[in-house]
A protein has these predicted regions:
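Terminal and linker regions of secretory-pathway proteins
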Residues: 2-474
Length: 474
């Protein structure tokens, strides 16, 4: 979910090192309070991986392995991960990572509320298997980042999307060394909300590291990146602040403002928000200018519009106290019996104010990732930008305009391609268009967390994108 903190993109100087240098890979097994851990120390990156095998929590499908634990990505920096093998053919299935947004929100949201192996239904206090889990098709890796989010704990030097990327890459490098059977598999990055920042930047960083490894200027495992998917993402503030106005006036569910209000807000956008954003035009914009832009645009556009009626910003069809998706999983993850089994060492925090404030101080939210997204599309990997049409906070009008604004060799063809009905087994699920390796999808009847509201549509879109295909109806 998007909690809208301000961030700045600062280059990460120097290499990432752990507290003590490791001369060669080491693997050991330890028992703590009745829980067995595998400990792996990665010589190349100095990372330390510590995890529990087959906890019996969440994924209970017979024969499907799971691993949960921590990667120490730096001094006192312990990043939480939870990995589930595919339910079908894990030795050949692709590998995908999932990141929730914030910035500063846990990927356990996605695991338990959206696309993970288990979910909570009908008010149950314990989870049941999710038949639409994305691990029916792919091996799935959920990561809590930056430090301080979810079960991750320790010191957090990350204050921007750009500074977050190397730590995620480092985790993946250690993961591949511990689980080398997956390193040659097709790999995808899937994310939502502030993932409109995370997704393009992480993909671009991984591709740049691949090039450095190929040229010999860096060492590591080549990541076979084939796909990027971002639903209800926050990519470009100039486009998407205007979309707050347009969507509030014209959506299929709940008109929030009238024509006069729309005109007034549009004038305010042109006179205050847009000029402030102009001062923060790229990742090289100053922290103060970008932070100021976020403050101005929130006060003049987002804040007032979010109070334009009694509605849930994540699902405009519902009142502000909307109880869905249910937060039952948070109570479940505070159970000492559960945390012991999965190897968690900290108290679960769904969204971390401190992690988000780091981004806030650098104005990261006000920086556009549109050009980075264009570079990723131009690289040739399969890219899906999609959105549930009942979400307000990162609404589909903004997402659609972002998709059309992406600069790449087939931009004109993409802009001029008509939308078509997207069906799942003949049932209408939305509107889409695909040109070469780039797709847009509007999902009917879905709020911010698309896989929760429309799991069948989400699973099909995921499979097609991860399978290096453009979207197509079935």
């Amino acid at each position: 979910m998007l909690t809208k903190f301000l961030t700045a993109a600062l280059a990460l100087g120097g290499s990432l090192v752990a507290a003590s240098p490791i001369l060669k890979d080491k693997r050991s097994f330890v028992e703590r309070d009745g829980t067995n851990f595998t400990v792996f120390e990665h010589a190349a990156t100095g990372a330390k991986l510590e995890f529990v095998t087959n906890s019996g929590i969440c994924e209970t499908t017979p024969g499907v392995n799971q691993y949960s634990g921590y990667l120490s990505v730096g001094t006192n920096m312990n990043m939480w991960f939870w990995f589930f093998e595919a339910r079908n053919s894990p030795t050949t299935a692709p590998l995908a990572t999932w990141f929730n947004g914030g910035p500063g929100c846990s990927s356990m949201i996605g695991l338990f509320q959206e696309n993970g192996p288990c979910h909570f239904v009908n008010g149950a206090s314990t989870p049941s298997l999710n038949p639409y889990s994305w691990n029916t098709y792919a091996n799935m890796l959920y990561i809590d980042q930056p430090i301080g989010v979810g079960f991750s704990y320790g010191s957090d030097p990350v204050t921007s999307t750009v500074t977050a990327a190397p730590y995620v890459w480092k985790l993946l490098q250690a993961f591949f060394t511990q689980f080398p059977q997956y390193e040659n598999h097709d790999f995808g990055i899937f994310t939502e909300s502030y993932g409109g920042h995370y997704g393009p930047e992480f993909a671009a960083y991984f591709e740049s590291q691949n090039s450095a490894i190929s040229s010999g200027s860096a060492t590591g495992t080549h990541v076979n990146l084939v796909a990027l998917g971002v639903n209800n993402g926050w990519f470009d503030p100039t486009i998407q602040y205007q979309a707050y106005i347009d969507y509030s006036y014209n959506n299929s569910y709940n008109q929030l403002i009238d024509a006069s209000d729309r005109q007034s807000y549009t004038q305010t956008m042109q006179q205050s928000c847009a000029p402030a954003l102009t001062q923060c035009t790229s990742l090289t914009g100053s922290n103060s200018a970008c932070a100021n832009a976020q403050s101005v645009c929130y006060q003049d556009i987002e804040g007032p519009l979010s109070q334009a009626g009694n509605f849930d910003v994540y699902d405009v069809r519902e009142p502000s106290n909307d109880p869905y998706p249910p937060s039952t999983y948070q109570t479940y993850l505070t159970s000492s019996a559960v945390t012991k089994k999965i190897g968690a060492k900290s108290t679960y925090t769904e969204c971390s104010d401190s992690a988000g404030q780091g981004f806030s101080q650098t104005g990261d939210n006000s920086r556009s990732l549109l050009s980075t997204l264009g570079s990723v599309v131009s690289s040739g990997i399969q890219v899906l930008v999609w959105a549930g049409d009942a979400d307000w906070i990162c609404n589909y009008l903004g997402g659609f305009n972002v998709a059309n604004a992406v600069k790449w060799s087939s931009q004109s063809a993409f802009q001029n391609t008509a939308l078509k009905s997207y069906t799942v087994s003949g049932k209408a699920g939305g509107l889409f268009k695909t040109v070469k390796n780039f797709s847009w999808l509007q999902v009917y009847g879905a709020g911010h967390e698309v896989p929760y509201y429309q799991p069948e549509v989400a699973l099909q879109a995921f499979k097609q994108t991860m399978g290096k295909q453009g979207l197509s109806s079935t």
